[in-house]
Amino acid sequence: MMRIALFLLTNLAVMVVFGLVLSLTGIQSSSVQGLMIMALLFGFGGSFVSLLMSKWMALRSVGGEVIEQPRNERERWLVNTVATQARQAGIAMPQVAIYHAPDINAFATGARRDASLVAVSTGLLQNMSPDEAEAVIAHEISHIANGDMVTMTLIQGVVNTFVIFISRILAQLAAGFMGGNRDEGEESNGNPLIYFAVATVLELVFGILASIITMWFSRHREFHADAGSAKLVGREKMIAALQRLKTSYEPQEATSMMALCINGKSKSLSELFMTHPPLDKRIEALRTGEYLK
């Protein structure tokens, strides 16, 4: 279902835009306390914008279509399955959507537990057995029931705040050092062009490094969503679903969507930057019951 995904690209863009606003409004000349307040507002602002727009952005990204009225037996089964599991998990009925993609995948998103969305690919409906598909849907329902999207928003907000604040403090120091002379007693932050250039570069660099934190949480929540699915439909069904994912096409969803999907891309320079744990680790965690306690 959920997490850091729209977040990485969306928040990166939001922070750069907010960075420009900060520079144009002269916030670099403000006190440390003022800068922290602005960093908090803009840091959490980017996350909450992403959260509030998450359903619209996710559907637009994959070209998904919300099922208003089931048109065939497959759609009817999907809606009924989501409704049954939502009742079991104690959440309101999510919107249900289908999107065209050959890979086996699904995601859930939404600003609140009671205003969420579950979407599945046509590849999942065509290539998974009913038991396997039930397990994947239960995984997404668990993401919603666990409140992962809101938690991710708070984590991303904190990360954004520190990225903005530290980047601009260091940019002030750099601009003051390279900005030339100033009269005694005159307050100056140096060359504003240097300030903005340094702040932007540092935000990008620190943003990439900070993504390690959000990626870790994304992987951690996947284990808990797998465990939630096992509790809803049974451990063996979830294990079978993960084993089926190992034979799936490479996910076709955009990179910014990967953290929302059950089947993340398997290739990565390092597991530190993966949104999902390797499938073998997820299967092993279910077999040992590590997250089922």
UniProtKB/Swiss-Prot annotation:
Undergoes self-cleavage. This may not be physiological. It is a multi-pass membrane protein. One of its GO terms (biological process) is response to temperature stimulus. One of its GO terms (cellular component) is membrane. One of its GO terms (molecular function) is zinc ion binding. Residues 25-33 are periplasmic. Gene3D superfamilies: Metalloproteases ('zincins'), catalytic domain (3.30.2010.10). Disruption phenotype: No visible phenotype, however one of HtpX or FtsH is essential for cell viability. Its cofactor is Zn(2+). Binds 1 zinc ion per subunit. The active site is at E140. It comes from the Bacteria. It is an enzyme of class 3 (hydrolase). It is found in: Cell inner membrane. Belongs to the peptidase M48B family. This is Protease HtpX. It comes from Escherichia coli (strain K12). The gene is htpX.
